[in-house]
């Protein structure tokens, strides 16, 4: 027991004289490690009588706890001193401005789509989506586009095989809606479309929004009124708008819509017309009872006109210097 008492006193004295955490850890190993001085005393248990063993074992455990408690106390003291020294060495100038994070912003094409959806949503139009990989019936046949129409040519359309292609327009969404829902219908279908073209005003992938209204006694005057209001709302100006006759296989009569630009020239912005009876028949709607109108617009085209962008390709080059202008 005398030897144990001396070892504990030596350990406590060493802990008191320790200068840092490393020295404390060395002391812990020297006295409490597997080969430490206090641990080695347990080997004496074999030389003791049955009556002495419990008392000696208890004394060794008490010694361990005493040394461990002193080590823990001293370690906390050193950690506190280290933290205090670190804080004293670090100086913070509270007058410096904070580190700001740039807020993200919507892509200009997304802004335009949301603006279009908002306007037509207030008129009762719902947003419909459809597949971007389309079959020839929904992309061409049901839209009254003949087998020999130029739009079906390989140089205009990306084909997977003669019957399957990347959609060239979102009109297929209108066909699918009319196949599954009964009139009255009011829908718009925004989405990506694909055509084999690439220059300052065309890219192989771009965005369209097409609209469809089918009901009884629908007429061209309603179409003109809605599109006229839309264009004035979108450009936030009292624009001059004109409708001029045109041709689309899926509408009859058909028109293209122009607005007067700031340079005094007419600018084409969208196409429209009354839904062709053949299109209604292809989806099982009686053209004698129902009529409708449809319209389609290129999102990038409208965005270019609204923001004065000259090159459509800039929307897809991910240049932050360009995109940050629309935040």
Swiss-Prot record:
Alphabetized SUPFAM superfamilies for the sequence: Class II aaRS and biotin synthetases, tRNA-binding arm
Subcellular location: Cytoplasm
Cofactor: binding comment: Binds 2 magnesium ions per tetramer.
Catalytic activity from the UniProt record: tRNA(Phe) + L-phenylalanine + ATP = L-phenylalanyl-tRNA(Phe) + AMP + diphosphate + H(+)
Keyword set includes Glycoprotein: no
Gene Ontology biological process terms in this record: phenylalanyl-tRNA aminoacylation
Lineage, opening ranks: Bacteria, Pseudomonadati, Pseudomonadota, Gammaproteobacteria, Alteromonadales
Sites where the protein binds Mg(2+): 252
Name recorded for this polypeptide: Phenylalanine--tRNA ligase alpha subunit
Keywords: Aminoacyl-tRNA synthetase, ATP-binding, Cytoplasm, Ligase, Magnesium, Metal-binding, Nucleotide-binding, Protein biosynthesis
Assembly and oligomerization: Tetramer of two alpha and two beta subunits.
Organism: Shewanella amazonensis (strain ATCC BAA-1098 / SB2B)
Pfam families named among the record's database cross-references: Phe_tRNA-synt_N, tRNA-synt_2d
Protein EC: 6.1.1.20
Cofactor: Mg(2+)
One Gene Ontology molecular-function label: phenylalanine-tRNA ligase activity
InterPro entries: aa-tRNA-synth_II, aa-tRNA-synth_II/BPL/LPL, Phe-tRNA-synth_IIc_asu, Phe-tRNA_ligase_II_N, Phe_tRNA_ligase_alpha1_bac, Phenylalanyl-tRNA_Synthase, tRNA-bd_arm
């Amino acid at each position: 027991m005398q030897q144990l008492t001396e070892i504990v006193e030596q350990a406590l004295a060493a802990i008191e004289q320790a200068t840092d955490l490393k020295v404390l850890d060395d002391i812990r190993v020297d006295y409490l490690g597997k080969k430490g001085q206090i641990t080695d005393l347990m080997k004496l248990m074999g030389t003791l009588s049955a009556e002495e063993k419990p008392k000696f074992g208890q004394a060794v455990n008490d010694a361990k706890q005493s040394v461990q408690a002193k080590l823990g106390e001293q370690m906390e003291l050193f950690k506190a001193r280290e933290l205090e020294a670190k804080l004293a060495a670090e100086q913070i100038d509270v007058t410096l401005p904070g580190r700001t994070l740039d807020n993200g912003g919507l892509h200009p094409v997304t802004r335009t789509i949301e603006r279009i959806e908002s306007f037509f949503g207030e008129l009762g139009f719902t947003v419909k989506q459809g597949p971007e990989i389309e079959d020839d019936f929904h992309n061409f046949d049901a839209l009254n586009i003949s087998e020999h129409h130029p739009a079906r040519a390989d140089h205009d359309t990306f084909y997977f095989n003669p019957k399957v292609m990347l959609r060239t327009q979102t009109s297929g969404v209108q066909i699918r809606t009319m196949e599954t829902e009964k009139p009255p219908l009011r829908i718009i279908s925004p989405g990506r479309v694909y055509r084999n073209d690439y220059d300052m005003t065309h890219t192989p992938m771009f965005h369209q929004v097409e609209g469809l209204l089918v009901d009884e006694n629908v007429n061209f005057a309603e179409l003109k009124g809605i599109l006229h209001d839309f264009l004035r709302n979108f450009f936030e100006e009292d624009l001059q708008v004109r409708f001029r006759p045109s041709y689309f296989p899926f509408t009859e009569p058909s028109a293209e819509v122009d607005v007067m630009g700031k340079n005094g020239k007419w600018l084409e912005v969208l196409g429209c017309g009354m839904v062709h009876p053949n299109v209604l028949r292809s989806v099982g709607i009686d053209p004698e009872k129902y009529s409708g109108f449809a319209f389609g617009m290129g999102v990038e085209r409208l965005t270019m006109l609204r923001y004065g962008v000259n090159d459509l390709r800039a929307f897809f080059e991910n240049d932050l210097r360009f995109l940050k202008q629309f935040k």
